[in-house]
Amino acid sequence: MFIKKEIDLGQGKVITIETGKMAKQADGSAVVRLNDTMVLATVVSSKTPPPPSQDFFPLQVEYREKYSAAGKFPGGFFKREGRPSEKEILSARLIDRALRPLFPDGYYQETQIIISVISSDTINDADVLGGIAASAAIMVSDIPFANPMSEVRVGRINGQFIVNPDTEELQRSDLDICIGGTEDTICMLEGEMKEISEAEMLDAIKFGHEAIKKLCAFQKELAAEVAKPKRAFAPTVAPAELVAFIEANCAAELKALAYTPLAKEERSDRTKAIYKETIAKTLEHFSSITAEEIAANPEKALCQSEHMIDECIHDVEKKVMRHMILDDSKRLDGRTLEQVRPISIELGLIPRAHGSALFTRGETQALVTLTLGTKKDAQSVDTLTDDKDKRFMLHYNFPPFSVGETGRVGGTGRREIGHGNLAERAIKMVMPAEQEFPYTVRLVSDILESNGSSSMASVCGGTLAAMDGGIPLKKPVSGIAMGLIKEGDRYAVLSDILGNEDHLGDMDFKVSGTRDGITACQMDIKIDGLDYHILETALEQARKGRLHILDVMTEAIPESREDIGKYAPRLTSIQIPVDAIGMVIGKGGETIRSITEETGAEINIDDDGTVTIACSSPEGTKAAVETIKTLVSKPEVGTIYMGKVRDIRDELGAFVEFLPKTDGLVHISEIARERIAKVSDVLKPGERVKVKLIDIRKDPRTGKTKFALSIKALLDTDQPAETNGEAKPARD
């Protein structure tokens, strides 16, 4: 049955959802459209029961942008889409993080959601549309999913909030936030801002939630019209006698352990020991259950399931920690709710890096290094809505040894890409303008230890490494991860959460910013019922923690160093006439390559005539600048050049190219002090010679300008060459 519905979100943003036309063999499918941007979402969930030992939800979310959607050809030899781009991975994570907590607890069927961008108007990003389409596809399927989820992007121009701004509007917006939620609550948040206040952030979330409510109600209407029955699903529940036995045998030990401040590794070892002992006791206690009893009551088999016993112990551990925090305002490492772990900072410890910082907060440690490059080092970004050179990037690496484990070491994982992107967005807002600091900047954050909040350690370490490397940041940025424990109406907001507090808690809310406002945020919620008062509390508590961390960072380095690292390339910019660009580049790049070879400088020329020269030595920079300036200048009498002999006329003289495409004659009488019989006895074609321009005149017959050069005039003075027709310094 084909159904098509339309909703107007205001401000000219009309969204259409249809189902029943495309991908009908999937469990559910939906097409969402905004202007000429369209996404197709499909969902399929396995009907084969998962193995009894499975304790996780194998959800796979794939987001793919087809180049054909925008009438483009993919790059590369094969001319087809390859592995997911960074943009596609980040979009998939946005959708995954919002949908995952909404599936029923205990639903472990293998489920795959594929979002395909099938049309793009190149100005409306399809990522939030993909979230709506994915939720709609699940709603019209038979997969158990009680409440729809919707995603919107919120911008603000001149104080006015905008829902789903296009790329042109985002250029003028001071914030870019993606919000995912249900009719009742927000479950996902991610974005970047230009130092907005906590109150402004809250207003943006409320504005976005109003649009989300409309879209969720819209999806419910669509699902009601399709009216597809949901498949039967009942989560496995542990028998009451099993729960009671486990609580009686391990709750006291787990509580005593929770109230004992320990390092991560020691706590983990002692927790594993309690698990092992409790599992053994439980299996022994229920070993007397017979096959006949299980046949009469299949639930009793769960009492002999090591997997179910493990889950029950985990529930007790979670309950103990949460009650400790709510009842006693005490945390696993002994801190108060708002206390930040001890911080240590070391700068400049990597000698050859252009800047470096080792940032340690508790048992989380990030080593961040800075590399400065030229425009040629910028990353080329080609997406459906963007085609640019990216001159600032932050890469995040999370090796398995950082958590005391072994594991695969290879390509960058989705989590690493997501964490790096968040840290990059936080610092990007305070990076200097290209005109002020024309370098390409790469920060690499290697996590050496992790016990929570490693992405925020990357923000702090990245800021410190940038300042150590002499980048004139507008302001320093710090970051902090907030947690939440909520039971009914009782709740506690935690500052600078540990890994266990993230795992056993209800929220992971990362906030980065300067002293004056927020620059980036990311939030994931595992529960329903998060109200705005809790968000307001979390934002204010995050502000206090952020300022505390900034105080520690400022003690380590009050402001950016005055100069860049000694091994960083030095950039110098000069302006040349646009019509002289070809002269500097030369035929087939001959001239510019020549300058690079002789001076060691790397040269980039923009279309507006801006020439950027990068060289590690001041001498090379000076030589390159002088050569380029002379190349684009008009010939002047008395100026000395380094030229190349182009042609020899034995009885007349030598024609020397002293500027690109500009030849002059060195008369035979101007070659040497003594008389010479043949020019070829002294000069050879291709030879470089130092010449002085002694006369400029027009040929009365042809009207062409002729240049008279002299070698002899320099033999007495022995002056150094001021330039080089081939853009190379003089050599005697």
UniProtKB/Swiss-Prot annotation:
Its cofactor is Mg(2+). Involved in mRNA degradation. Catalyzes the phosphorolysis of single-stranded polyribonucleotides processively in the 3'- to 5'-direction. Residues 569-628 form the KH domain. Mg(2+) binds at D502, D508. InterPro entries: ExoRNase_PH_dom1 (IPR001247), ExoRNase_PH_dom2 (IPR015847), ExoRNase_PH_dom2_sf (IPR036345), KH_dom (IPR004087), KH_dom_type_1 (IPR004088), KH_dom_type_1_sf (IPR036612), NA-bd_OB-fold (IPR012340), PNPase (IPR012162). One of its GO terms (biological process) is RNA processing. SMART domains: KH (SM00322), S1 (SM00316). SUPFAM superfamilies: Eukaryotic type KH-domain (KH-domain type I) (SSF54791), Nucleic acid-binding proteins (SSF50249), Ribonuclease PH domain 2-like (SSF55666), Ribosomal protein S5 domain 2-like (SSF54211). One of its GO terms (molecular function) is polyribonucleotide nucleotidyltransferase activity. GO terms for cellular component: cytosol. Keywords: Cytoplasm, Magnesium, Metal-binding, Nucleotidyltransferase, RNA-binding, Transferase. This is Polyribonucleotide nucleotidyltransferase. It comes from Chlorobaculum parvum (strain DSM 263 / NCIMB 8327). Its EC number is 2.7.7.8.
